[in-house]
A protein has these predicted regions:
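HotDog/MaoC-like acyl-thioester-processing domains
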Residues: 1, 62-64, 73-102
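Hot-dog-fold acyl-thioester-processing enzymes
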Residues: 1-50
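A conserved acidic, glycine/proline-rich C-terminal tail/linker
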Residues: 44-81
């Protein structure tokens, strides 16, 4: 996962970390990042394909009220690289999602 690189400078989604995103330690729960990333893809994608592999590299923590911006590169052949930044600059996590035919 550390080799995941995202070149895109255009955000595909922006959201603010809410109460339901926060774990008992006051951080955004790691599962919520995965859910936000999976929400980037249209429902049709899930009807036609399945996720073969999902890699995640956590880099930093984020907290209630942080603005999370998601960037995505389509690497081709069903491979997507995603990066989440908080408050416009610091990378929180990177992910590689690989889809395959059902």
């Amino acid at each position: 996962p550390s080799r995941i690189k995202v070149a895109s400078k255009e955000p595909v989604a922006t959201l603010v970390a809410k109460y339901s995103d926060i774990d008992i330690n006051g951080h955004v729960n790691s599962i919520r990042y995965i859910e936000h990333i999976l929400d980037l893809f249209p429902i049709e994608m899930y009807k036609e394909k399945r996720i073969r592999r999902f890699e995640m590299a956590y880099v930093a923590e984020s907290y209630y009220g942080d603005e999370l911006t998601l960037f995505m590169d389509d690497a081709g052949e069903g491979v997507y690289d995603v990066e989440v930044k908080k408050n416009g600059s610091e990378v929180v996590c990177r992910s590689k999602v690989i889809f395959t035919e059902k």
